[in-house]
From Swiss-Prot:
Record GO biological process: rRNA 5'-end processing
Cellular component aspect of the GO annotation: cytosol
SMART domains for this protein: YqgFc
Enzyme kind, highest EC tier: hydrolase
Organism expressing this protein natively: Pelotomaculum thermopropionicum (strain DSM 13744 / JCM 10971 / SI)
Stated name of the protein: Putative pre-16S rRNA nuclease
Entry keyword annotation includes Lipid metabolism: no
Alphabetical list of InterPro entries matching this protein: RNaseH-like_sf, YqgF, YqgF/RNaseH-like_dom, YqgF/RNaseH-like_dom_sf
HAMAP family linked: Nuclease_YqgF
Gene Ontology molecular function, alphabetical: nuclease activity
EC number per UniProt: 3.1.-.-
Pfam families per UniProt: RuvX (PF03652)
Length: 154
């Protein structure tokens, strides 16, 4: 089952998708937000059908002290809208620092400022989804198909 990860922004929604086994996240799309984020449900629904998505993970913005602000309430409302419209499980996932981490990775990759602007939301969605996938304890396979023995210990 594929899992979709979403990074909600005021102007864009970054979209990431897991591989069918749920081990790795890849960037998929950036959806321009026209009106309230709920207006983007149609495009997300198309992607869900196209890729056979069985679950959606929505980034939940939290303040550094763990409290929730207005953006978190928007994320909760959007997650509820998605769950109702798509009849899929939707999970909220802590997204603290993902945009900063995405920016750092893109700078290290020597992407121009213009190119970073184009892909940062997608990269943040990848980081949110990969964090979720890693938390699920799915064993990773080494090259050659060998299983190293289960989830990695921190």
């Amino acid at each position: 089952m594929r899992i979709m990860g979403l990074d909600l922004g005021d102007k864009k929604i970054g979209v990431a998708l897991s591989d069918p086994m749920g081990w790795t996240a890849q960037g998929l799309d950036v959806i321009a937000v026209k009106g309230p984020p709920e207006a983007s449900v149609e495009r997300i629904s198309e992607l869900v059908r196209q890729y056979g998505v069985g679950k959606i993970v929505v980034g939940l913005p939290r303040n550094m002290n763990g409290s929730f602000g207005p953006r978190a309430e928007r994320a909760r409302a959007f997650a509820g809208c998605l769950a109702g419209a798509l009849n899929l499980p939707v999970e909220l996932w802590d997204e603290r620092m993902t945009t900063l981490e995405a920016e750092k990775l893109l700078i290290e990759a020597d992407l121009s400022r213009a190119r970073r602007r184009q892909v940062i939301d997608k990269m943040a969605a990848v980081l949110i989804l990969q964090s979720f996938l890693d938390s699920q304890g799915r064993p990773r396979r080494e090259a050659g198909g060998k299983n190293p023995g289960g989830p990695e210990e921190p």
